[in-house]
Curated annotation (Swiss-Prot):
Keywords: Cell cycle, Cell division, Periplasm, Signal. It comes from Pseudoalteromonas translucida (strain TAC 125). This is Tol-Pal system protein TolB. The keyword Signal applies. One of its GO terms (cellular component) is periplasmic space. The gene is tolB.
Length: 452
């Protein structure tokens, strides 16, 4: 019934302390009819004073955003058990629930907390009454195989959100067989016109919490892109009155100038092995905008496209052998694939009037893009094997889609009330939410890889 795969969730700390409050605040805009019901019961708390963070609320929000789960409203829960032995399996099965998370938080000394939790298959629990027996070395041993996961950990008072995301990852993988992406981060650009340095390069948790400003500038910042190990960001800056590409180390804050040619220096994208960088330059004599490949070790540049039309917005196929890019060589902007070994180019997009900002999902099966049809710019996806096409959003002037490393969600920039905001959509289009910044406009989101 459930894929019982062990999970190892490791966390990368970016070398700076974060604040818990969010500059981005999630607003749900569309529900998740058809998703799997799941119960995330509020954890029982034993301690003096309020609990630093309600773990169950963070987990329920994580799972709902994936589009695959529909957490039961607390007010609709038939009971609120804190451990498996307290669960009335039949009452949950009658509500259509397949799995339930229960747990406890116990305050320790010196700002530490003991957290215990169990993920329970309530259907299996109802069938077996919570106890089964199996033969081991000729002996009949009692087994509780309806408990899919049981863990306990000591965490600090500042670690509740991070640990909640870790539990979400465990649940997601146990119930889907796919790795969760709730411990990841996003990078984006905030523009605050009233600030002395209005352009800010920011990194936060994927849900907008623990925001950290990496760079403030008087000139525009664009196109942040993560290295595959999650330790660096490449981005475009106009600090010296022309476009330049930098790579910045997230641990030390040190940054390195990569290109600063006259004309366009843009759209950096790290290769899957982190050794190369795709970028867009207009440095040749004709001023043509073309896609280049930069070897970060040897600094050798290789021109990949040669066409009189604009070639831009490159991204890597997960196989590391192909790239996709946007080109106007067919008249309107469309998405093409280029094989790095053969140089063969193939058009991938045909639906609507034009298609932009293409990227391939981590499993290599789908193309995500911005599609323009009848003057409307929406996120869409196409199955590469069948050609099946689906529009995912109904927001305005969508741009800059970035896919979660497990392929479950997409973050993008859109227009809401004439203001640029970030938005989330699940890969199946069932769940949608806005992440409006409290001050300023937000654009150019980039989802991190898994953080190890």
């Amino acid at each position: 019934m459930f894929n019982k795969v062990k999970v190892a969730c490791l966390i990368l700390l970016l070398g700076f302390q974060g604040v818990a409050n969010a500059a981005l605040e999630i607003v749900i805009t569309e529900g998740i009819d058809g998703a799997r019901p799941i119960a995330i019961v509020p954890f029982k708390y034993q301690g003096i004073g309020p609990i630093p963070q309600k773990i169950s609320e963070v987990i329920a929000a994580d799972l709902m955003r994936s589009g695959k789960f529909k957490p039961v409203d607390v007010a609709q829960m038939p009971q609120q058990p804190s451990k498996d032995s307290d669960i009335n399996y039949a009452s949950w099965v009658n509500k259509g629930v397949e799995a339930i998370l229960v747990g406890e938080v116990e305050q320790q000394s010196n700002g530490r907390y003991l957290v215990r939790y169990e993920l329970v298959d309530v259907i299996r629990g109802q069938i077996t009454g919570g106890q089964t027996q199996m033969m081991t070395n000729g002996k009949l041993i009692k087994n509780q195989d309806h408990i899919l996961e049981a863990r306990e950990s000591i965490i600090s008072d500042t670690g509740f959100r991070r640990y909640s995301h870790r539990i979400s990852d465990v649940i997601y993988e146990k119930l889907t067989g796919e790795k969760g992406a709730f411990l990841t981060k996003i990078a984006y650009v905030i523009v605050r016109d009233n600030d002395d340095r209005p352009y800010q390069l920011v990194v936060s948790d994927y849900d907008g919490f623990n925001e950290q400003v990496l760079l403030r500038s008087k000139e525009p910042l664009m196109s942040p892109a993560w290295s595959p190990d999650g330790t660096k960001l490449a981005y475009v800056t106009f600090e010296n009155r022309q476009s330049q590409i930098y790579i910045q180390d997230l641990y030390s804050g040190k940054r390195e100038l990569v290109t600063s040619y006259p004309g366009i220096n843009g759209a950096p994208q790290f290769s899957p092995d982190g050794k190369k960088l795709l970028l867009v330059l207009s440095k040749d004599k004709t001023g043509a905008t073309e896609v280049y490949l930069l070897d970060l070790v040897t600094r050798k540049e290789t021109r990949l496209t040669r066409h009189r039309s604009i070639d831009t917005e490159p991204s890597w196929h997960p196989n590391g052998q192909d790239i996709v890019f946007t080109s106007e060589r067919g008249g309107n902007a469309q998405i093409y694939k280029l094989n790095l070994k053969t140089g063969r180019t193939q058009r991938l997009s045909f639906d609507g009037d034009m298609n932009l900002a293409g990227s391939i999902t981590p499993d290599g099966k789908e193309l995500v893009m911005v599609n323009r049809t009848n003057g409307q710019y929406h996120l869409a996806k196409k199955e590469l094997a069948t050609g099946a096409f689906q529009v995912l959003t109904r927001t305005r002037l969508d741009e800059s889609p970035s896919i979660a490393p497990n392929g479950s969600m997409i973050i993008y920039s859109t227009l809401h009330n004439n203001k640029q905001v970030l938005a989330l959509v699940s890969m199946d289009g069932r769940f949608k939410a806005r992440l409006p910044v409290l001050d300023g406009q937000v654009k150019a989101p980039a989802w991190s890889p898994y953080l190890q």
